[in-house]
Design a protein with these regions (language model features):
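Conserved N-terminal Rossmann-fold NAD(P)-binding element of oxidoreductases
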Residues: 4-8
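N-terminal Rossmann-fold NAD(P) dinucleotide-binding loop
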Residues: 13-14
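Aromatic pocket-lining residues of Rossmann-like dinucleotide-binding sites
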Residues: 20
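N-terminal Rossmann-fold cofactor-binding loop
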Residues: 29-35, 51-53
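Conserved Rossmann-fold cofactor-binding substructure of NAD(P)-dependent oxidoreductases
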Residues: 43-68
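NAD(P)-cofactor binding segment of oxidoreductase domains
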Residues: 68-107
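Conserved Rossmann-fold NAD(P)-dependent oxidoreductase catalytic core, especially the SDR/UDP-sugar
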Residues: 92-132
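Active-site Tyr-X1-5-Lys
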Residues: 131-140
Length: 140
């Protein structure tokens, strides 16, 4: 059975995890809140508390990634109220753990903010034109 780890089981990651379980996948899910652990477990998701920081990643990351073939990175940059956070540094600290584990495929969930506010049809070929700090950091 394919094991998938979803880093960030919030408004998008949690329903994604439940849908993957229904398709027969084994799913690990992360949250930053102890309050959400029970809900993840009740849904059949193997829950983990994982904290990504600009300086380090929590020790739980190794067990979270262990035996997973696919990693879905689904965490927001959280820059609306705090433009001083460095989302790129957080992802850079995650990379060595991914490189050392069994993950062979990574899906990074981004945001339409990397395209700016042109209100045009967007495809994968659309040039990036971020107009916010979050969009700029995601575009990196």
């Amino acid at each position: 059975m394919t094991q998938i780890s979803i880093l960030g089981c919030g408004w998008l990651g949690f329903p994604l995890a439940k849908a993957l379980l229904q398709k027969g996948f084994s799913v690990k899910g992360s949250t930053t809140s102890m309050d959400k652990i029970a809900a993840l477990r009740t849904a059949g998701i193997d829950p983990f508390i994982v904290q990504l920081g600009e300086q380090k990643v929590s020790d739980t990351i190794t067990d979270f990634l262990a035996n997973s073939e696919i990693l879905v990175v689904n965490i927001p940059p959280k820059l609306r109220g705090n433009a001083t956070e460095n989302f790129v540094a957080k992802i850079e600290h995650l990379l060595p753990f991914i490189e050392k584990c069994t993950v062979t495929k990574v899906l990074f969930v981004s945001s339409t903010s990397v395209y700016g506010e042109d209100n045009l049809h967007v495809t994968e070929a659309t040039p990036l034109n971020p107009d916010s700090e979050g969009g700029r950091q995601l575009a990196v």
